């Protein structure tokens, strides 16, 4: 999305049959890393970047926000609560928000505010293949345990994980 936006605006070319691109500021929050030299944790750096985005959105310019797994540097409950609150806020601004998440709870909380899409995969001969085609709606089945299985994790771990998932649903 980001590369298509940039190439569309600069080169008047993008990978699309048709594109209508708004004049907007593009923000990407995808590859944040800990910085041991500056004693800055992943979470603190992410919070600082999100705060900059919040301060910059809602002004006279539209914004396109590309966000990946918000607040993944903290515990599950606070991550989901914080991400839901930030995304709900950004959605009210002049923003086009694109966010990726593995948090099923977050997707159900945002279902009435955002158009939800997902990717699926198939397993062929113990190899996982992604088609990278967006499908509407919430992903119904995860793939983490299946990947553990494909990577030949001990059966005890795989079965235990499956059991825990069933108990948590």
Task: Annotate each language-model stretch with its function.
Residues 1-169:
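ATPase nucleotide-binding head domains, primarily ABC-like/P-loop NTPase cores
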């Amino acid at each position: 999305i980001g590369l298509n936006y940039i190439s569309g605006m600069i080169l008047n070319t993008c990978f699309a049959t048709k594109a209508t691109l708004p004049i907007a500021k593009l923000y990407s929050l995808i590859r944040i890393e800990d910085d041991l030299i500056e004693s800055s944790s992943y979470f603190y750096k992410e919070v600082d970047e999100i705060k900059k985005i919040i301060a910059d959105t809602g002004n006279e310019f539209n914004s396109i926000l590309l966000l990946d797994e918000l607040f993944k540097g903290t515990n599950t409950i606070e991550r989901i609560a914080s991400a839901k609150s930030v995304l709900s806020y950004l959605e009210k601004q002049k923003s086009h928000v694109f966010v990726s998440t593995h948090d099923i709870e977050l997707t159900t909380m945002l279902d009435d505010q955002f158009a939800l899409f997902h990717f699926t995969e198939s397993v062929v001969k113990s190899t996982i293949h992604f088609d990278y085609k967006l499908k509407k709606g919430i992903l119904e089945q995860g793939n983490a345990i299946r990947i553990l299985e494909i990577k030949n994790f001990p059966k005890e771990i795989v079965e235990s994980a499956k059991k825990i998932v069933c108990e948590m649903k």
